[in-house]
Amino acid sequence: MLGTYLPIMLLILVALAFGLGSVVFSSLIGQKKFSKVKMAPYECGCEPIGTARERFPIKFYLIAMLFILFDIEAVFLYPWAVLYKKLGLFGLVEMGLFVVILFVGYIYVWKKGALEWE
């Protein structure tokens, strides 16, 4: 059984070795001189305008977290959709309960005003 996973493990080892080898090799042979130009933030070849340390409104982080939450919901729903015929009524009830719990969470977030941009 271990033999079936051998190509995947070999691929992971080669990828890790290549990545780590590239980082170590570039740090060994790369130049170590830092100048003001090299330490400036890169903005698409244009001159930097203002500071790179801007504060973002907390709403952006909240929307990103909600996006990740509902994206994970889709990840959990995909295997259920693939195995729907094998799971039968039990799988339908289980996923229905899962979706209802997430919908209640969505309503809670909506009622708290997290989705409003004022």
Curated annotation (Swiss-Prot):
NDH-1 is composed of 14 different subunits. Subunits NuoA, H, J, K, L, M, N constitute the membrane sector of the complex. NDH-1 shuttles electrons from NADH, via FMN and iron-sulfur (Fe-S) centers, to quinones in the respiratory chain. The immediate electron acceptor for the enzyme in this species is believed to be a menaquinone. Couples the redox reaction to proton translocation (for every two electrons transferred, four hydrogen ions are translocated across the cytoplasmic membrane), and thus conserves the redox energy in a proton gradient. InterPro entries: NAD(P)H_OxRDtase_bac/plastid, NADH_UbQ/plastoQ_OxRdtase_su3, NDAH_ubi_oxred_su3_sf. The chain crosses the membrane at residues 5-25, 62-82, 87-107. This is NADH-quinone oxidoreductase subunit A. It catalyses: a quinone + NADH + 5 H(+)(in) = a quinol + NAD(+) + 4 H(+)(out). Coiled coil: none annotated. GO terms for molecular function: NADH dehydrogenase (ubiquinone) activity; NADH:ubiquinone reductase (non-electrogenic) activity; quinone binding. Its EC number is 7.1.1.-. It comes from the Bacteria. HAMAP family: NDH1_NuoA.
